[in-house]
């Protein structure tokens, strides 16, 4: 609730300012940052990135990309509703400033604000002269840009009242942290005030950031507080060294006051200053931007039947298209999350689930399936937007007339969602030839067929032989391979490779639709070593991926856009390319089979209306209800004994009542969404569930992030799912201490006041749960969970295949099966 109140006070005037250019070193690589010492007024270019010396894992080239470009433009509306519960998600804009339609446009001004990279560091010391007007000394002043901006326009002398507050001293030497907004500006001031030895010698560390980041300050306070503590220790170390130096020279007495103003910290301690700045620039600020700008997944309530129907149909499509009759990849992955990671990811903040894939559409579909098994889910009511049935029917008729769709029975389309866009199955070869003559000129990639103009496109190098490869007698769920590779002499090579594929494998072009009994068959086990291996503390050189799309990926990182890769043979099994919106025209329409009719109007989640932004759900109704109950309480709301104390001239009437916080109150809808997100162009250390491009670079970033997590914990864990190689790995990394120095065994090494050093080694343990189509060695509990998941999916398949069952009974049974999966560990 505090975040909502803070957000409502945030002004939107600063968000609408467009920047013609940006010279921030965080945005543009190899641009120097400028560090200015207030005492001398000189500028010098900062040295290289010097970060934490405990575990040297970061390099300047590995700075996390946290800018959220309009990547949602490449996602269909149906998939947006699955992942986020809304078609429109505003970037860096409070909910109370949204338009009446519940969303914003995708223009660059409202989506991206590059000035959120800017920040300012101020270190100010009180001179101890109460009667003097100039009672404060500027020790250090740093900003991210040499260009004059709103942060530099405010002089430090104008900030002293906001930093130190009242000149009245407290009786004890207390330390305080303050967060406040600066009037008539779009800035937030975060300040820590502490003392060294004297009451009248206060020191302030102030961080000035754009007010657009205020809603995520509370969530990211642990990283901000850690940076303030490190900076405070650094300044105290400077003062201690200066005091020891004065004691050795005989210039120190009991009445002497050690001042930072007597130390030129920029000249004497350049390395420490660089560590302070770069830690803020490469860790804290990217974390704030990630929390603010990257959209988070919305976990639907488990009692929302429309979501449950869509979720089961997504599972059926994945198994039929991706897994094949014998693979069992998805049931094993679901069982791994249900039995283990569902609880681990909530209790262990350093645990992560990462999907590695070169196809954004595939990864987002799998994220939707897996996120439904995680907690915490939304427990409030979901608003369903009403619409005119007559307008829907007219829209459907227009779609049929424009696209000339072939009518199909309702039962044949029951397992398809509107985002799949698969080609329909022909009844036989004769009907196939007859229907081809009646197909209209609208192709798969035409705007009439897809609702989006921007899409995940295959590079449209067209030639006369471009066509769609479709096997005879194939079903609706078969993988349709695009013939976007070169024709000519190489065509026989690809044809022979497709024919040589085994007819039952998940990558075969000629795989027939399996029966329900063929979906779940045991796969051969894979033995491996599960012992802990010692890991080097220093990271090696990062290896670049050698895929054909690496050059385009590198270009897309600089342009902050989602990489659009050309297909390769190893990526054909990741999902049908026909399911991507805005695909180019493929082949001659006279040889293409008829299309499935557009069933987007039957998508169960199409009328979901959720007010949210990137990180929070709007709960204005709950706030209004709570304030009404406080201001106008009723006897029913009190529900217990109460007492009223009459007021007097000093205070108003006071009502006291018993507070009984039960489980029902604690399970109220959560405003802040969990740190689960979608497919990102780079791996992001600040999210626990995500997808990113496959390659050595992503795996290196994941390993480095696990080492960074060990700076504040002794154990971290990640579940890596590679869709390209069909690989599931459970990677655990822990830190074992080998020695004990300074007799600090009774202190917590992660305490901010701990100053000792202990030797340690990093050990890594990797379990191959699934590799190369084979299931690894599983525990008994995991095997039981896999069997339970398979039986549940079988029951759901038979439930949805039964056309004679009542709709209400189907809804209740589907909810029961889904609830048994979600609460499996509690029941078992």
Curated annotation (Swiss-Prot):
Domain cDENN FNIP1/2-type: 310-712
UniProt record, GO biological process: amino acid transport; protein transport
Entry GO terms, CC: cytoplasm; nucleolus; nucleoplasm
Keywords: Amino-acid transport, Phosphoprotein, Protein transport, Transport
UniProt region (Disordered), positions on chain: 1-25, 423-444, 538-569
UniProt feature, compositional bias: Low complexity: 543-562
InterPro entries in alphabetical order: DENN_FNIP1/2, LST4_longin
One family name in Pfam for this protein: Longin_2
Domain uDENN FNIP1/2-type: 114-302
Taxonomy, superkingdom: Eukaryota
Domain dDENN FNIP1/2-type positions: 718-825
Post-translational modification Phosphoserine, affected residues: 401
Homology family: Belongs to the LST4 family.
PANTHER family: MYND-TYPE DOMAIN-CONTAINING PROTEIN, NF-KAPPA-B-REPRESSING FACTOR-RELATED
Function in brief: Involved in extracellular amino acid uptake. Required for the trafficking of the GAP1 nitrogen-regulated general amino acid permease from the Golgi to the plasma membrane.
Protein name, UniProt field: Protein LST4
Gene assigned in the entry: LST4
